């Protein structure tokens, strides 16, 4: 075979839309398996082999296995999958999404409230009301389609979508609200069904008889009957649900068929009434509609239904002695009110007429019903109070937004398809098509019915919520054809089926939330029975549903129900907005007819409906969400679901960092950005209290609201898996310890070994942080002198910190520092030895802002050798300076007296010199010693520069020099000749004798200062001292520098050494 004809591969085109592989056999379609391989393929199912074809991409055996980029993608992880697998998911768009969603959306509210909404708002404003409600659900459906096609939707439906996209906190909060929405919806459906039974099917069942149903007060007999029978029906339906979900599923198609027939009967009735011009009649005095029971009372005392007597009814629409007694009985009584006179006058002066209640669809009626006529409670017509025992009056006041709140539950139910994702053959196609189609269909049905009612029923009858004028018959049922029972029975069955569905789905939703283990209090509800039924969840659902039933009225329950659904819908829209605006890499929805502005409009509409309907209830819903959010955050939501809130946080952080300029801040804006260096002994069996105490101190310094990073040094290598596992455990411990001391910040670990200490520390200081958010303050602990590793680390941390121009804070006696819960009183003493820009005072001030140190008093001891004649002037100048700094502190000037070198000092200095020589000899005798790099390359000690910036706080190094007080420059000064040798390093050209004298002088300073501090601060809670500039010569650091500091702090319990870089200038400016 020639090279030109030789083939090295075969290519198969994949139809991604149909999830089928197109073979070469004449267009034959091959079924594709779950892993993307044809189901009947019997060969090697691996894409790569250990030898040959893709050996280039085969990983070394020593390297941990990584996922191939062509491996299967699964979202979410295995632990997030449903516990039960369906044998076969074969439902399509129609049976799996479209019809169930329509069945859930269309309900009792459409039959018992839509006509009344039209009567109050008019056709035009009802169109606007429906537009707002339907548009909010349509936009939410679009957002839902985008989110649902951006991955696999598991059990939990809407809760799964929200929690996996907004995080555990928001997911739990909105999940609980969605659970409450389903539970309270069950209450509304049950109360609506009871209303249909008692008002329109069997009024004789009412306790107190049919007449008791006329008492429409909140705690009147009508609503008490609804509460009682609602509780009975709730228990019956709970028993049915406890028997299993299969029975509930059997009722769904029956309920849907009855609803469809009822809608068709309404439309048929509008047409039939227009053709025949026959229908039920009503009586009215002028335009005041009368209750039919009053009109029929003289002849049919106990009759409440008269469908077969429409012809004779108009004969009863005439004034009679009985009607006169109803309207004018109290006129002649002494207890007669002004209203009684008005009722009687209207009755006697106006004509009583018989009107056709259902003239059939016509433009005249439509025009008459076009504009709103909102009414207050007990009004018979707008602005006129009616006689409640005789006329048809309103049982509650109405406004546009109140009507919107009542009707909004009629458009909910769009998550039905999402909840059935596990039963769908192709969820990513079925959910968008089915949900949006169902939303558009139901919206069209509502518009058609609203126009039908507005054009087929007179205005006065439309306002008759309970059908009092037509023999307590449902208004929509009286319009229908061929028989009112089609609508009445259909309305009841729709409520019964919908309530069963809610009682079935709500406990399972609660179980999904509890199973995620983000709300500990819900843990018991994760358990199920042997038949996989969440019995405990059902019990809680019944209890909450009973609370909803106790509200009594459908309208009251609907107003509460809105907010649960609206919060859920708003967050689904926000998910889509969040992912789109942040351009998340994993945001690749298959649903293409989506734009984030639509989702933003949907979220805005949801919040608008909430706050327009009821500001108090909206605030309660938002507060409930916030409370659950903070509860989950407080309990520690340890789930990581790759949610969008993390993406939002990252984007916000990026934006903020870019706004912060990467340069030194103005002195007014300086605050400690703390890097806490920990060299503790990390062990699972032992807790090193030094690390916890360091974190405690770091938390107490966070009054400056700066950055905090805790870094633990570990001896090891990044190449060792054992060391990496240990580092991960240490970081976990560190995070827990930071949380326990309430230090909010970041934790990290750093490996080092004996040959990398210098580069490790230097690299850490140079690289840590990002942009303008970099640590400027290093907090480190005095090392354990018996641990050589800690000594070497400490030396490098100090030297490189100084070279990097960081503020250094060194703690001594860290285990004696107070814990978070302690409250100290006493003194915080600042021993001001060198001019440092005021960093000691700033650190002390920040510590005092914390509740641990708040009870302490600041004292400043300025050490000086000024003569007594100038001491008072210096004290006055310093007092003014402290006052202008706005720091409350007591100021003391300390004059050192005895300057003689004692024998003790000479002995200690000689000891330091002897140790120095021993270590030098040891260093020379060992090649490749750990600290070979302590010297410069030329073998000479590194020259040490003063760390205190000349521009910020300069002083003369010559003995006897004095600096002046200049308050305009916020300077304080005092004689520093005494400490020149102590607070600076020696020069490289000093001979041994000069070095010995220098050591004696430094040791003398340490001893003298220690005695003075112990004399003046014997009981201080904390002492702050200037940190002498460290030598860059490591041998000098280990041999003498640490010894001086040890002597300086001898017998002092808590000490902070603070060394400024000169940038931390505390100013008197505002």
From Swiss-Prot:
Gene Ontology MF terms in the entry: potassium:chloride symporter activity
User: Which cell locations does it reside in?
Assistant: Cell membrane
What tissues contain this protein?
A: Expressed in the amphid sheath glia and the cephalic sheath glia. Also expressed in the inner labial and outer labial sheath and socket glia and as well as phasmid sheath glia.
Q: Which UniProt keywords apply?
A: Cell membrane, Chloride, Ion transport, Membrane, Potassium, Potassium transport, Symport, Transmembrane, Transmembrane helix, Transport
InterPro entries, per this entry?
AA-permease/SLC12A_dom, SLC12_C, SLC12A_fam
The record, for PANTHER family, names: POTASSIUM_CHLORIDE COTRANSPORTER 3, SOLUTE CARRIER FAMILY 12, CATION COTRANSPORTERS
Highest taxon of source: Eukaryota
Q: How does it sit in the membrane?
A: Multi-pass membrane protein
Per the record, GO CC terms? apical plasma membrane; plasma membrane; synapse
Q: What is this protein called?
A: Potassium/chloride cotransporter 3
For the keyword Transmembrane, the answer is yes
The residues that cross the membrane are 92-112, 114-134, 142-162, 174-194, 196-216, 228-248, 251-271, 400-420, 433-453, 473-493, 534-554, 557-577, 600-620, 791-811, 827-847
Record flagged with keyword Ion transport = yes
Task: State the function annotated in the UniProt record.
Answer: Probable potassium/chloride cotransporter that functions in the amphid sheath glial cells to regulate thermotaxis behavior. By maintaining chloride homeostasis, negatively regulates guanylate cyclase gcy-8 in the thermosensory AFD neurons and thereby controls the microvilli receptive ending morphology of the AFD neurons and thermotaxis. Modulates the temperature-evoked neuronal activity of the AFD neurons such as calcium responses to temperature gradients. Might also play a role in the chemotaxis behavior mediated by the sensory neurons AWA and AWC.
BP-aspect Gene Ontology terms = cell volume homeostasis; chemical synaptic transmission; chloride ion homeostasis; chloride transmembrane transport; microvillus organization; potassium ion homeostasis; potassium ion import across plasma membrane
């Amino acid at each position: 075979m020639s090279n030109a004809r030789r083939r090295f591969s075969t290519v198969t085109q994949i139809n991604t839309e149909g999830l089928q592989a197109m073979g070469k056999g004449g267009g034959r379609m091959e079924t594709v398996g779950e892993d993307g391989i044809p189901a009947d393929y019997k060969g090697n199912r691996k894409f790569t082999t250990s030898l040959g074809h893709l050996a280039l991409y085969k990983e070394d055996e020593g390297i941990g296995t990584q996922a191939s980029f062509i491996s299967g993608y699964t979202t979410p992880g295995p632990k997030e999958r449903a516990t039960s697998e369906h044998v076969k998911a074969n439902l399509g768009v129609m049976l799996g999404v479209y019809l169930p969603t329509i069945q859930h959306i269309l309900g009792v509210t459409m039959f018992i409230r839509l006509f009344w909404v039209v009567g109050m708002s008019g056709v035009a404003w009802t169109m606007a009301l429906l537009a707002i409600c339907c548009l909010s659900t349509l936009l939410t459906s679009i957002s839902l389609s985008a989110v649902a096609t951006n991955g696999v939707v598991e059990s939990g439906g809407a809760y799964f979508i929200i929690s996996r996209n907004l995080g555990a906190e928001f997911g739990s909060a909105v999940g609980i609200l969605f659970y409450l929405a389903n539970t309270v919806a069950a209450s509304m459906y049950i109360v609506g069904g009871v209303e249909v039974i008692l008002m329109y099917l069997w009024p004789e069942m009412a306790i107190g008889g049919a007449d008791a149903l006329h008492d429409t007060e909140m705690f009147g007999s009508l609503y008490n009957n609804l509460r009682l029978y609602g509780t009975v029906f709730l228990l019956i339906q709970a028993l049915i649900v406890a028997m299993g979900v299969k029975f509930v599923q059997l009722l769904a198609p029956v309920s849907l068929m009855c609803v469809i027939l009822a809608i068709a009967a309404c439309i048929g009735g509008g047409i039939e009434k227009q053709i025949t011009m026959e229908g039920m009649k009503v009586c009215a005095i002028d335009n005041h509609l009368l209750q039919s029971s009053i009109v029929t009372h003289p002849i049919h005392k106990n009759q409440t239904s008269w469908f077969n007597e429409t012809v004779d009814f108009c004969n009863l629409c005439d004034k009679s002695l009985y009607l006169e007694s109803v309207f004018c009985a109290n006129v002649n009584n002494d207890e007669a009110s002004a209203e009684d006179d008005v009722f009687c006058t209207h009755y006697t002066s106006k004509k009583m007429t018989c009107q056709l209640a259902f003239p059939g669809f016509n433009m005249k009626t439509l025009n008459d019903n076009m504009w709103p006529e909102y009414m207050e409670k007990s009004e018979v017509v707008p602005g006129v109070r009616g006689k409640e025992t005789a006329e048809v009056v309103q049982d509650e006041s109405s406004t546009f937004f109140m009507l919107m709140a009542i009707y909004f539950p009629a458009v909910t139910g769009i998550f039905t398809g999402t909840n059935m994702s596990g039963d769908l053959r192709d969820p990513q196609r079925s959910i968008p098509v089915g949900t949006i189609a169902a939303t558009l269909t139901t919206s069209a049905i509502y518009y058609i019915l609203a126009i039908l009612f507005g054009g087929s029923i007179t205005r006065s009858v439309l306002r008759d919520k309970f059908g009092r004028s037509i023999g307590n018959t449902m208004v929509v049922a009286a319009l229908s054809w061929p028989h009112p029972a089609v609508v009445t029975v259909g309305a009841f069955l729709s409520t019964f089926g919908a309530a069963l569905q809610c009682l079935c789905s709500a406990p399972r939703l609660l179980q999904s939330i509890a199973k995620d283990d983000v709300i500990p209090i819900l843990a018991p509800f994760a358990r199920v029975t042997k038949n996989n039924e969440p019995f405990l969840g059902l019990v809680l659902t019944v209890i909450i549903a009973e609370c909803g039933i106790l509200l009594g009225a459908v309208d009251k329950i609907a107003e509460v129900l809105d907010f649960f659904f609206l919060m859920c819908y708003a967050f689904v829209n926000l998910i889509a907005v969040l992912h789109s605006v942040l351009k998340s890499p994993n945001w690749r929805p298959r649903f293409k007819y989506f734009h984030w502005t639509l989702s933003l409009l949907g979220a805005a509409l949801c919040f608008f409906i909430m706050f327009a309907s009821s500001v108090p209830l909206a605030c309660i819903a938002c507060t409930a969400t916030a409370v659950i959010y903070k509860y989950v955050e407080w309990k520690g939501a340890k789930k990581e679901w790759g949610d969008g809130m993390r993406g939002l946080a990252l984007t916000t952080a990026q934006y903020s960092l870019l706004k912060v300029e990467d340069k030194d801040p103005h002195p007014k804006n300086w605050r400690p950005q703390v890097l806490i260096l920990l060299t503790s002994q990390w062990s699972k069996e032992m807790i090193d209290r030094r690390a916890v105490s360091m974190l405690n101190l770091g938390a107490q310094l966070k009054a400056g609201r700066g950055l905090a990073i805790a870094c633990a040094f570990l001896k090891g290598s990044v190449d060792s898996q054992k060391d990496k596992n240990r580092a991960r455990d240490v970081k976990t411990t560190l995070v827990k310890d930071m949380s326990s001391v309430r230090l909010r910040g970041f934790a990290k670990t750093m490996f080092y070994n004996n040959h990398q200490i210098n580069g490790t520390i230097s690299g850490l200081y140079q690289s840590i942080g990002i942009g303008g958010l970099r640590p400027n303050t290093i907090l480190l602990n005095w090392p354990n002198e018996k641990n050589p590793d800690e000594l070497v680390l400490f030396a490098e941390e100090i030297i490189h910190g100084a070279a990097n121009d960081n503020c250094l804070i060194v703690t001594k006696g860290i285990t004696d520092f107070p814990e978070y819960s302690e409250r100290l009183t006493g003194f915080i003493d600042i021993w001001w030895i060198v001019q440092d820009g005021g960093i000691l005072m700033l650190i002390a001030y920040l510590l005092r802002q914390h509740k641990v140190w708040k009870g302490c008093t600041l004292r400043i001891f300025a050490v000086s050798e000024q003569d007594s004649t100038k001491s008072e002037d210096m004290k006055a100048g310093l007092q003014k300076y402290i006052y202008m700094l706005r720091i409350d502190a007591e100021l003391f000037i300390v004059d050192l007296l005895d300057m003689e070198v004692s024998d003790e000092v000479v002995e200690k200095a000689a000891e330091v010199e002897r140790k120095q020589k021993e270590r030098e000899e040891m260093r020379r005798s060992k090649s490749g010693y750990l600290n070979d790099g302590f010297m410069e390359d030329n073998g000479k000690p590194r020259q040490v520069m003063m760390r205190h910036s000349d521009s910020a706080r300069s002083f003369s190094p010559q003995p006897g020099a004095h600096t002046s007080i200049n308050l305009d420059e916020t300077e304080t000064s005092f004689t520093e000749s005494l400490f020149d040798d102590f607070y600076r390093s020696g020069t490289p050209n000093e001979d041994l004798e000069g070095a010995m004298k220098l050591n004696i002088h430094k040791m003398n300073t340490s001893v003298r200062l220690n005695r003075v501090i112990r004399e003046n601060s014997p009981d201080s809670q904390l002492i702050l001292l200037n940190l002498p500039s460290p030598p860059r010569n490591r041998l000098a650091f280990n041999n003498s520098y640490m010894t001086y500091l040890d002597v300086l702090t001898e017998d002092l319990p808590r000490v902070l050494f603070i060394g400024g870089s000169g940038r931390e200038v505390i100013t008197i400016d505002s």
